[in-house]
Amino acid sequence: MADGNEDARAEDLPGPAFENYEAMELACPAERSGHVAVSDGRHMFVWGGYKSNQVRGLYDFYLPREELWIYNMETGRWKKINTEGDVPPSMSGSCAVCVDRVLYLFGGHHSRGNTNKFYMLDSRSADRGLQWERIDCQGIPPSSKDKLGVWVYKNKLIFFGGYGYLPEDKVLGTFEFDETSFWNSSHPRGWNDHVHILDTETFAWSQPITTGKAPSPRAAHACATVGNKGFVFGGRYRDARMNDLHYLNLDTWEWNELIPQGVCPVGRSWHSLTPVSSDHLFLFGGFTTEKQPLSDAWTYCISKNEWIQFNHPYVEKPRLWHTACASDEGEVIVFGGCANNLLVHHRAAHSNEVLIFSVQPKSLVRLSLEAVICFKEMLANSWSCLPKHLLHSVNQRFGSNNTSGS
């Protein structure tokens, strides 16, 4: 489950038995790292990942594959749904997106190794039960891998990089073996800089012929799409965790490296990079070459080509291998991840906390709702005057749990 192949990894341990996973129903997801989270703007969907075993001590194990957790970004409430159908195996390091409320899931690492299987789930049928569907795509797929990135553009999912097995077929791009993976595995792995396209209308794989100087192979990097540009920042390659910034023109397939002005974030892997406007990206957390977890946040201004450090109240809450999703209200919702060095042999500090970053001004409706809640005792007798949908939001918020807001 590491961003390369170092120390003891949970992926090398026996698969868990899930029948005694939780004796009590949880009001929120279990703590985890290496999960996926995607958003439709109002809801965040969380699946997969792994956590520490409370019984067997140092052992980590994958979380139940049937569980999909849905977080209401307006009310701060969680809901668990047990999915059915072609349910993916329990995994970490998968790659996921949400397009028109359809969840797409590719790759990852499970108890038997890496995979290159592709799944989809239509969240619009949540009231009738959610069904996973495994898609047998046409064309030559990417190699089996995890810790890769993805951009969404028009009807295409564009995947980049990752850590996994040598491709079985001839592909465009570079693959570099991780020499340490030969020591403890019969299936050595490595990093790559491959770009693969999946057309969501035909479900056919293809590879573009890119121009320009491509980034080095890497894994545990972060990708974000703004317009026709696919940005990638950082990630791990061999012993280095990098802080380089590139974008791929998703119309012309030309790579460009960006050299920002002024101070830049330190090199890192296992961080998040989230589009928050047509001109800004939001960076949070990660893990340095010196194996230090990070709690810093930055905004990158595309038009000015500069990084600006973002002040926030979570400086004592470092996170790595977490997830981050943007809401329609100008917030970035960070969930889960690890607060310490998960590569060492003592227990990893996995989290199930929600951190909320306000990166855009709040709407008047949002400010009004927060005022109503803040002065609830004074205004409670007037709640009946609220429109039904606003009254519902107010009532829901009083049941919120496990959130922190800026």
UniProtKB/Swiss-Prot annotation:
Predominant localisation class: nucleus
Sorted UniProt keywords: Kelch repeat, Nucleus, Repeat, Ubl conjugation, Ubl conjugation pathway
Pathway(s) where this gene product acts: Protein modification; protein ubiquitination
InterPro entries: Gal_Oxase/kelch_b-propeller, Kelch-typ_b-propeller
Keyword Ubl conjugation belongs to the record: yes
Top-level taxon: Eukaryota
A matching Pfam family: Kelch_KLHDC2_KLHL20_DRC7
CC terms in the record's Gene Ontology section: Cul2-RING ubiquitin ligase complex; nuclear body; nuclear membrane; nucleus
Post-translational modification: Autoubiquitinated by the CRL2(KLHDC2) E3 ligase complex.
GO-annotated molecular function: ubiquitin-like ligase-substrate adaptor activity
Residue spans of the Kelch repeats: 31-85, 92-136, 148-207, 221-259, 271-311, 322-359
Single biological process term from Gene Ontology: proteasome-mediated ubiquitin-dependent protein catabolic process
Subcellular location: Nucleus
Record's function text: Substrate-recognition component of a Cul2-RING (CRL2) E3 ubiquitin-protein ligase complex of the DesCEND (destruction via C-end degrons) pathway, which recognizes a C-degron located at the extreme C terminus of target proteins, leading to their ubiquitination and degradation. The C-degron recognized by the DesCEND pathway is usually a motif of less than ten residues and can be present in full-length proteins, truncated proteins or proteolytically cleaved forms.
Assembly: Component of a CRL2(KLHDC2) E3 ubiquitin-protein ligase complex, also named ECS(KLHDC2) complex, composed of CUL2, Elongin BC (ELOB and ELOC), RBX1 and substrate-specific adapter KLHDC2. May form oligomers as a KLHDC2-ELOB-ELOC complex; this interaction is autoinhibitory for the E3 ligase complex as the substrate-binding site of KLHDC2 is blocked in the oligomer. Interacts with CREB3; interaction is direct and specific as it does not interact with CREB1, ATF4, ATF6, JUN, FOS, CEBPA or herpes simplex virus transactivator VP16.
Protein name (Swiss-Prot/TrEMBL): Kelch domain-containing protein 2
